[in-house]
A protein has these predicted regions:
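Secreted/periplasmic carbohydrate-active enzymes, especially glycoside hydrolases
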Residues: 1-167
């Protein structure tokens, strides 16, 4: 599957704090060593930086550098089916003057935790949640599987109207 090459995990989440792990590999295909700044930011829905890691990296000529940055997010806005809040994790490579090189990949991030217990069932963010599931096939006549965004949104709204919270 295609991806940005940026991997985001949540090793620890609570109502008070979320620990965010951001991993990736930087590759230098140049014949010279690269001295760069790696900037990892967590942005809220307004684009405001709410957590950041900034450090210098050196990558040898025709070399690679694997990184893992750990960020702390205080009092995170938790994701849930009723409040599907998404942060955005942005990774930038900058030259020594601070100019952004190439692209700045962004990865959506929903901060949440869950647990499953035989007696208490499924909990999302510490609250019981009854999973109401359905299967969805993404096809419609005469489009086949080439659905527009509007068609996908309509399908999701129909599922939500049916009480589905798990697809």
């Amino acid at each position: 599957y295609a991806s940005t090459g940026i991997y985001v995990d949540l090793p620890s989440v609570s109502e008070d704090r979320a620990e965010i792990s951001v991993r990736g590999t930087l590759v230098n295909r140049d014949v010279r060593r690269a001295v760069l700044k790696l900037d990892v930011e967590v942005l809220d829905t307004d684009g405001k930086t709410v957590a950041q890691s900034l450090r210098s990296v050196r990558i040898d000529a025709d070399g690679a550098f694997a990184f893992e940055e750990r960020l702390q997010l205080e009092k995170p806005q938790l994701w849930s089916p009723d409040s599907p809040y998404l942060y955005s994790v942005k990774v930038s490579l900058k030259d020594v003057r601070g100019k952004v090189l190439k692209d700045e990949p962004r990865v959506p991030l929903g901060v949440r935790w869950f647990s499953v217990d035989a007696q208490e069932g499924f909990k999302l963010n510490g609250e019981p949640l009854k999973l109401m599931g359905a299967c969805r096939h993404q096809d419609q006549m005469p489009m086949g599987i080439a659905l527009s965004d509007e068609m996908h949104r309509r399908d999701m709204q129909l599922l939500k109207d049916m009480g589905v919270n798990f697809v």
